[in-house]
């Protein structure tokens, strides 16, 4: 952890204020390395573990560098998954809260028309998955003429998921005069080639862990036949009694099967895989993040980009077939300086996958023998007690910064020739209110939304009921959340 403070980076007071509200005390190692170079607008290739504060390392400079006055997108962030796109958009919104930075997330299986409408509004930063971003570019609904900054996040995962061709197609459409940042946990040849082809003399930054995986994770291997996996899973979880655990399966069918069996055994659990509708996936991840349940059964869709710091255990119910996936899965634990455990089940026919993984991570995973019946019985009472305990809901790390914000609805927008500056000018004249109390402003054709910060919402709402904007008296009320 760096001894530096974020105020050492010559950031605007609005960004520093947001970081303070988010509880960012000191830059992590990756933030300390990346932010100063990014603020100089130099291209960057960053090799860094997940869970290292990476999103803020590009989110902070992006929010600092974009110009609020410009209405068209100035930055594009590409992510491999929808979950990560939403997560990054939320993080950027919170970092840029007091600078009134407007971020939009675009991804598949979400209505295109709604995204098109959002992109017509003032938007500073667009975060999205490659397929949907390319759709918007091809249909002319994502303006690129003012784009100055590109971030490719989780580049190795883009490669694994077959998105590199789409990423290249997107880059070919972007202005050549731009700054590009590429982030990856690993740097396979195709990712290196991407940086050589599309980047301008990039600065390379590598945040070294002890080997490929962090030394905060304790790795263990259990040999088991397929039919006895479920029994072993129940024994291991009884002994370990984890606070928060992800159980990874190779297929959606296996996820469904394991989830049903654990649910039947009264485990506080849920599941996530690519076959579920998007809203359900988001809801499951949000509940898991808040601690509403302790066991998440998942395919690799959940292995990247989910910002949850306190996962104590990862169990590979099915050993991953790709060595990189082992790093990505186990990287869900041992984050943000916490320790964690990574437990892997292996059947007699899967040794070749294990050999590849061990060669890749640079050490042999210690083998263990499954718990005895006596050991399981000894821990059963404590396990059962925790199983039936009321969940402790975790505090949302964004709660403090979002406290005291009221979103106001006005029944007028572009068609009444109303602009963001009109709201700022009018509201800032209210006694006891300044421009710093005004957050993100969204102006649509017939309606507008204005965030009022610092607990000043009720005052502004009361005054604006009898105050005109550009000579027009608009209806105003608190927006429905």
Swiss-Prot record:
Cleaved signal peptide residues: none
GO molecular function terms noted in the UniProt entry: 3'-5' RNA helicase activity; ATP binding; ATP hydrolysis activity; RNA helicase activity; RNA strand annealing activity
SMART domains the UniProt entry points to: DEXDc, HELICc
Predominant location: cytoplasm
Residue numbers binding ATP: 48-55
Broad EC category: hydrolase
Keyword field contains Repressor: no
Residues in Helicase ATP-binding domain copies: 35-205
Domain remark in the UniProt entry: Contains an N-terminal domain that binds non-specifically to RNA and a C-terminal domain that binds specifically and tightly to hairpin 92 of 23S rRNA.
Listed name of the protein: ATP-dependent RNA helicase DbpA
Name of encoding gene: dbpA
